[in-house]
Structure formats: C-alpha cells, structure tokens
Amino acid sequence: MVSTYRVAVLGARGVGKSAIVRQFLYNEFSEVCVPTTTRRLYLPAVVMNGHVHDLQILDFPPISAFPVNTLQEWADACCRGLRSVHAYILVYDICCFDSFEYVKTIRQQILETRVIGTSETPIIIVGNKRDLQRGRVIPRWNVSHLVRKTWKCGYVECSAKYNWHILLLFSELLKSVGCARCKHVHAALRFQGALRRNRCAIM
C-alpha cells in the first residue's frame, strides 16, 4: 500500500529551503540564490524500509503570517494548501538570527491556529548552511535544547550545498508523519544514527 503525505516547507528569504528540496530530489545545488515567489509543488515517490511513499512537497515563498482559517488560506494564492498538510519543515539559516525568529513566529502561529481536537501535525526545525559553521549566531546546543525539550519538535542541521544530512532530514520526516498517524507508535524522534537504522531512496 502506498502512503501519500503532504509536506509544507517554510522559511525566511535566503535560508536555502528550496535548495534543500532540490538537493534531495535532484542531487544538485546552485550558488545563485533565486527567491521563491510562488508556491512550488514537487511529487516524488520515496522508498523507505521497503515501503513506497508518495510525497507532495509544497515549497512556499516567505509568508507574513500563517493563515488563521481556511478562508484566509484560500484568499492568498501563496498560502493555498498550507493548513491541510501532514507535516511542516521550518528552515532557518544558522548564520542569521532573524531567520530563526521567523521560524519561531511561524511555529507559534501554527500552534495557535490548529483546530482543537485534531491530531498534532509534526513540525521539524531545520538549521541550514552548516558548512558556514564559523558564522553561527546561536550555539547549536541552545537551539537543540529549545526545539527538542521546550517545543517538542524534531531538529536537524544540514548543508544543502554539500548534501549533508539532507537524506536524514527526509528520513526523519517520514518517520514523524508515520508516528503521528499511528497512535500505537511512540512519536518521539531519534535523530542520532537514523541513517543506520533506516534506508531511504527516491524513485
């Protein structure tokens, strides 16, 4: 049986969210930053641990605020489909404090607009541009502790440029969505050693 998951990728301008998606899908990276101005949809099929998953990856341009209801969601073409996804990937640049503040704001708005009684939608926070480690503005431990312990979200650092931890990110994404859909499976994420335990490939 093939599972279909819709995933929204959000982040401030220039954080490399589109670069992450393209590195995952096409194994390519461009040094030229082309701002995302419209919503982009990618439809890859992914095999993980022998199971096929159809992904609908929605790459959104930066939004000023998360839509509070369906009416607001469909009034803005850039936000359509944002409230009905199975998981959110929120990307920030580890060298840009403002981009982390953006992620913090969007995450809070997602929680505030969530329909009461619905199942919790997984959120994974992603720190991109790990290859620019020397320019980091917030210590990794501080961010990791806040995201995992306080926010109860998954956390991954990656480098879209060097394809570092990109596969790990989407492997954990599939695991988190699967956990959210199966109540008998413990939903806590375990990122260390994930690639040794799971096999993930794109068709």
From Swiss-Prot:
Family that this chain belongs to: Belongs to the small GTPase superfamily. Ras family.
Organism: Mus musculus
Protein name from the UniProt record: Ras-like protein family member 10B
GO-annotated biological processes: positive regulation of peptide hormone secretion; regulation of systemic arterial blood pressure by atrial natriuretic peptide
Lipidation positions, renumbered (S-geranylgeranyl cysteine): C200
Membrane topology: Lipid-anchor
Proregion span(s): 201-203
Chief subcellular location: membrane
